């Protein structure tokens, strides 16, 4: 279960690539989509068909019986129904907005949680300060569940650490419990493990790929 401001989609893409390369079937739920709505849901590696997604949304609308529901909530319900009906080994789940009240946080016992870099975003919903925003995202952490933390500035890191302590989560932080850096044409994880450079462009992808490796290590 992945929250954060920047790098959620990239980190999930790296995790999916590693899991599939190892022979695992991964369901994926991300947002927003770039071109087509069905890009948000992958079932065991394949994009859900538009027809299947439309049918799932109709089922969810019927089950909801006219109660108030948001666009993201009904899409999340459709994704979860699709996941329940299709065999796979793992679900990679991205928060849509914040974390504390996000529809994806209905998952009570995730295998692990991850928080990518936190910065100012969605202030009208999450709060006016970096600490408030970090607190909303840090609320995905669960008792007894490892929380893998990406690169953070001081304020978000302190909030995440405090929230983890209050919730009984186990922290696995970048530059504390694990490291990722570029050395020549390799990504070096924990100072000794060498990987090819990420296929996605930008120096920030070193940290995103490092987070993905740290998550896979803890699964």
Question: What does each model-identified segment do?
Answer:
Residues 18-22, 82, 215-219:
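Active-site catalytic microenvironments for nucleophilic, acid-base chemistry
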């Amino acid at each position: 279960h992945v929250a954060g401001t920047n790098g959620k989609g990239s980190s999930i893409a790296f995790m999916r690539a590693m899991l599939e390369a190892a022979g695992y079937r991964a369901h994926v739920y991300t947002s927003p989509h770039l071109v087509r709505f069905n890009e948000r849901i992958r079932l065991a590696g394949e994009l859900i068909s538009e027809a299947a997604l439309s049918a799932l949304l109709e089922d969810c609308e019927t089950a909801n019986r006219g109660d108030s529901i948001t666009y993201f909530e009904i899409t999340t319900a459709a994704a979860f129904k699709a996941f329940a009906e299709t065999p796979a080994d793992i679900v990679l789940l991205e928060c849509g907005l914040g974390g504390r009240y996000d529809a994806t946080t209905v998952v009570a016992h995730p295998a692990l949680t991850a928080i990518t870099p936190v910065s100012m975003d969605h202030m009208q919903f999450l709060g006016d300060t970096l600490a408030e925003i970090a607190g909303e995202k840090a609320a995905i952490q669960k008792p007894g569940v490892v929380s893998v933390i990406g690169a953070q500035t001081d304020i978000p890191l302190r909030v995440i650490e405090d929230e983890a302590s209050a919730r009984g989560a186990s922290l696995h932080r970048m530059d504390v419990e694990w490291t990722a850096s570029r050395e020549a044409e390799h990504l070096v994880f924990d100072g000794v493990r060498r990987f090819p450079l990420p296929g996605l462009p930008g120096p920030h992808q070193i940290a995103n790929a490092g987070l993905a490796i740290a998550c896979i290590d803890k699964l």
